[in-house]
Amino acid sequence: MVKMTKSKTFQAYLPHCHRTYSCIHCRAHLANHDELISKSFQGSQGRAYLFNSVVNVGCGPAEERVLLTGLHAVADIYCENCKTTLGWKYEHAFESSQKYKEGKFIIELAHMIKDNGW
């Protein structure tokens, strides 16, 4: 008897010629380097990067949290493949100086690696 196992499939593959960031746990692509906005963010487990857009990421329900820069409505994001929580999405910023974060994504360095062309 042959045991069949389900292979891992990803929703999106980023082009191999680009520098990409991947989930450290399962290697699913998460973001293209061109989508990186800032490396100067702090996550709940250390340093984090702010991205304009991401792939292969699911989003939980939004909730209000007081972060280092004030009150925000954020939703936890997780890897669609391995379900590891990666960071969060900024849904709403209550401070006018923080509005640029709305719709953007935080991924903690503890959960991603650099792939392709580094």
Swiss-Prot record:
InterPro entries, A to Z: Yippee, Yippee/Mis18/Cereblon, Yippee_fam
Sequence positions that bind Zn(2+): 23, 26, 79, 82
Domain Yippee: 19-116
S-S pairs: none
Compartment list: Nucleus
Molecular function as annotated in GO: metal ion binding
Membership in a protein family: Belongs to the yippee family.
Gene Ontology terms: cellular component: nucleus
PANTHER family in the cross-refs: PROTEIN YIPPEE-LIKE CG15309-RELATED
Main location (coarse class): nucleus
Keywords, alphabetical: Metal-binding, Nucleus, Zinc
Protein name: Protein yippee-like 1
Origin: domain of life: Eukaryota
Protein role: May play a role in epithelioid conversion of fibroblasts.
Residue ranges of the motif Nuclear localization signal: 99-104
